[in-house]
Amino acid sequence: MTEKTIRLTTAQALVKFLNQQYIEVDGESAPFVDGIFTLFGHGNVVGIGQALEENPGHLKVYQGKNEQGMAHAAIAYAKQKNRKRIYACSTSAGPGSANLITAAGTAFANNLPVLFLPADTFATRQPDPVLQQLEHESSTAITTNDGFQAVSKYFDRVQRPEQLMSALIRAFEVMTNPVSAGPATICIAQDTEGEAFDYPVTFFQKRIHYLNRQIPTKRELTEAAKLIKASQTPVIIVGGGARYSDARKELIALSEQNDIPLVETHAGKSTVEFSFKNNLGGTGILGTLAANKIIHEADLVIGIGTRYTDFTTSSKTAFNPATKFININVSRMQTYKLDAFQVVGDAKATLIELTPLLKGYKTQFGDKISTYKKEWLKERTRLQHTKFNRDNFAPEIKNQFDQTTLNEYADSLQTEFTQTEALITINDTVAPDSIVVCSAGSLPGDLQRLWNPAVPNTYHLEYGYSCMGYEINGALGAKMAASDNQEVYSIVGDGSFCMSHSELLTSLQYGKKINIMLFDNSGFGCINNLQMANGSDSFFCEFRDNNNQIMQVDYAKIAEGYGAKVYKANTKEDLVNALEDAKKQTKTTLIDMKVLPKTMSEGYLNWWNVGVSEVSNKESITRAYEAKQINLKKARLY
């Protein structure tokens, strides 16, 4: 019997296949691929471009303005959808493909599914070397796209039309598997995109990818319950895996039943809203005082869906030497970290099974959880009301800029606004269900400490790769994923704005309103803090011109040129007025805030291991190195 076939080009088959991919979670099924971002060039416009023009199916097509920017929008879409829906990205060959590589790293580090479709050189090699092709004397097979191999969870090349079938099936298995979720890259030779093949019709049947919740073994659950009951001061670290598992109700139930405090990673923050009594906020290098105090007292840490990055563990100094660990994770590899007791399973499913086993158990924290939270809220209130003065101002980041330098910034930027006051003002003024997006600089620290999410899944921080430029481009993806009237706020510094804001124009083009909160302190403030804290002088991290004058940039005018509604706000009153007016707008807005350097929040009970120079002529650097060696003695080695 001859199998029924349909004759399609490789690109047409790709688009047809994408339209038939569904994901089912807890009995609910929906299309997995909602659309595709494209930036057409000679490598994809007559192949994938033609296929999308002819019959896109349900796929929504968005025109990106920069390959990395549109890819970050696609990544943010998947993140905001809790990895249950994605966008693909199609680019031309050469530099267009290369621009995706950084974004692939972002998706990889954050375990976020996205399908990358970079065009490749000719499979036939007839016109070689084609425009934008690299020529390696050692191998003709090497192309720009080999750079994706280090940053893809799945990587493949399609040089014949029939290869597409196995490549796509494998890619979707990886993207829809919670253990391996991340970027899948399929490089398609540009001549192959247009080549036809008789594809079996069965390949295009509706295909449902089932996201089954893995339940731990009875042994794992029983032993985990024993460890918890034997502890006096256990603490739960809520990681991104808990959020992607939709484990909010189960976390609250366990925490309330057993009086176990919750602390959060960036990826886990807003899984449970901050108003929950046992939620002490972010932990680690960027954590709250309350969370870091409680984690230092833990005799057992229960990590739920966390990778234990250095920012979560304070470079492995956050825990007492005797602290034990239980790691609950779908990834067996992640459960092995810190010599933990391993519980391999879905966060939600695991907590459903574990909670009944802990009935009657209570921790020994007593009123410490509420006391630490009250102390922290008092500290947050102090940070909300920091005021600059020209005589003896003590910024949060101390002993770096003297009063003369701070006055110079105040005069040059025409502001006395502190970063912490500005950020908390935004938190207090926006609608409770607003989504906040950020990624790099000092602002993630302020957000992790000071931003109190009132509604679950509204805190959107890319801190796996902490990629500058994600903030605005990612905000577009978050907006595309949000409910119709849900506002999205991009929290971005001037450094990240300069790095990339390409999809600001795309947001205006497609009527996807985002609100850009631009904090301008005229420099790379976060790294300047790190530099000076470790003994160096301020060196090429401030934005100063050839005459050593602080640069003054009108970022509002840049956004206005694109067509955004813009505001300038260097006081709390002006900021509140701008925020209220921005709510009334139907298109993208930007609020340009000049804030003083060194007025971001400082760390609490933390340490970050960075590569301080062992040898230097500067005494301050030598002291910093000696301090590092002292802290290393307190750190776990693995």
Swiss-Prot record:
Disulfide bond entries: none
Q: Which SUPFAM superfamilies match?
A: DHS-like NAD/FAD-binding domain, Thiamin diphosphate-binding fold (THDP-binding)
Annotated GO MF terms = 3D-(3,5/4)-trihydroxycyclohexane-1,2-dione hydrolase activity; acetolactate synthase activity; flavin adenine dinucleotide binding; magnesium ion binding; thiamine pyrophosphate binding
Ranges for the region named Thiamine pyrophosphate binding are: 442-523
UniProt keyword Zinc, yes or no: no
Involved pathway(s): Polyol metabolism; myo-inositol degradation into acetyl-CoA; acetyl-CoA from myo-inositol: step 3/7
Q: Which family does it belong to?
A: Belongs to the TPP enzyme family.
Identification of the protein by name? 3D-(3,5/4)-trihydroxycyclohexane-1,2-dione hydrolase
Upper lineage? Bacteria, Bacillati, Bacillota, Bacilli, Bacillales
User: Coding gene?
Assistant: iolD
